[in-house]
Curated annotation (Swiss-Prot):
A Gly-cisPro motif from one monomer fits into the active site of the other monomer to allow specific chiral rejection of L-amino acids. Homodimer. PANTHER family: D-AMINOACYL-TRNA DEACYLASE 1, D-TYROSYL-TRNA TYR DEACYLASE. It comes from Alcanivorax borkumensis (strain ATCC 700651 / DSM 11573 / NCIMB 13689 / SK2). This is D-aminoacyl-tRNA deacylase. It is found in: Cytoplasm. GO terms for cellular component: cytoplasm. One of its GO terms (biological process) is D-amino acid catabolic process. Keywords: Cytoplasm, Hydrolase, RNA-binding, tRNA-binding.
Length: 145
């Protein structure tokens, strides 16, 4: 499982010209599910996301997590995140989970994020989406499990 996490001052995702998810201050999460992933791994990743300290405290130091900062989450499925790009000029998606496995794991991830009591917006699984964001910092981290 890979999650590209970006601290944003605003972000929204559109499908067919309609906004389906939007947040202000918070984290934009691009979520890639791999073949070997399971709910236990997703649960560990969620705990990591929620507790990751990427927001500035009153002294300007990155000491606050998304809860401390009063932030929200925008979760978007993105299978291209798990592409193998080490060889050639065409990405290989052989490690990406089949949608039959990936969809329930993505939905589990979203449910676990919501269970922490934070506002969570989402894209649409397997849809063609347009994502707009203002990266705050910029602050971007690749989380892998």
């Amino acid at each position: 499982m890979k999650v590209l996490m970006q601290r944003v001052s605003e972000a929204h995702v559109d499908v067919s010209g309609r906004t389906v998810g939007a947040i202000d201050n918070g984290l934009l999460l691009f979520i890639g599910i791999e073949k070997h992933d399971d709910t236990a791994l997703v649960d560990r990743m969620v705990e990591r996301i929620i507790g990751y300290r990427v927001f500035a405290d009153e002294r300007g130091k990155m000491n606050w997590d998304v809860r401390d900062a009063g932030g929200a989450l925008l979760a978007i499925s993105q299978f291209t995140l798990v592409a193998d790009t080490r060889k050639g000029r065409r990405p290989s998606f052989s490690s990406a989970a089949d949608p039959v496995l990936a969809r329930p794991l993505y939905e589990h991830c979203v449910a676990q994020l919501k269970a922490h009591g934070l506002p969570v917006a989402t894209g649409v699984f397997a849809a063609e989406m347009q994502v707009s964001l203002v990266n705050d910092g910029p602050v971007t981290f690749m989380l892998e499990m």
